[in-house]
Amino acid sequence: MVGSAFRRIYPDAESPTTEEFHNGLYDAKGKHIVHLAAKVGGVKVNTEEVGEFFRMNSIINQKLLHMAHHSEATKVVSLLSTCVYPDAPYITYPLTENQLHLGPPHPSNFGYAYAKRMVDVMSRAYRQQYGCNFITAIPNNLYGENDNF
């Protein structure tokens, strides 16, 4: 939903080819990147294609952060999803960021959720090793136009 809302605001924004993506990031010196890219789907496809959701989203995340690091982008904000949080009994409400890695995510989003968790881990690792200003944010659940459940 965040991505489709972004496209409504910026209708000329489109998914670039790998080469355009690569060249665009290398030219992004001094710019901020908001990472919204992801393979997404409803519960049915998420449970049927668990490995594919993990693989594709892991590739997207790894390429983007690696290229952003080498482009010397000044900041990357990667959006996660509330599905990254584990279920009870691992958490208490209200949810806090320190509960993110306390247990497995719900099986209905397993591959997607773990890939999103890994972008958080990777952002922390790049920040620790290279001093990159890479952070993650978890927007609250939304309901509305373009929701797919």
Language-model region placement:
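Conserved beta-loop-beta element that borders a ligand/cofactor-binding pocket
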Residues: 80-81, 120-145
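Adenosine-cofactor binding site in Rossmann-like domains, unifying the SAM/SAH pocket
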Residues: 8-28
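N-terminal Rossmann-fold NAD(P) dinucleotide-binding loop
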Residues: 3-4
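NAD(P)H-binding glycine-rich loop region in Rossmannoid oxidoreductase-like domains
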Residues: 24-57, 67-70
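Active-site helix of classical SDR
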Residues: 111, 115-118
